[in-house]
């Protein structure tokens, strides 16, 4: 798998709600400058299988080569999500 097309977004989970199908969730993340929605599916890798919760600081990666709907706030398919502790960074 080529990771060079992956983009990282760091922010805090504001809400988690059911997605369009039984096996997806929509996570709204507030970054320093905007809100971003991520679709989390069974194909999304969550590091250490951490249970995602509201208020949790995360880094989410999405593939910029995949199509994304032209909506606001932006909505991406999350490929990988990891939780972050205070002042922790990931590259």
Give the predicted meaning of each segment.
Residues 1-26, 47-91:
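Short, flexible, surface-exposed loop segments at domain boundaries
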Residues 27-31:
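SH3/SH3-like beta-barrel fold
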Residues 34-51:
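Beta-strand/loop nucleic-acid-binding surfaces
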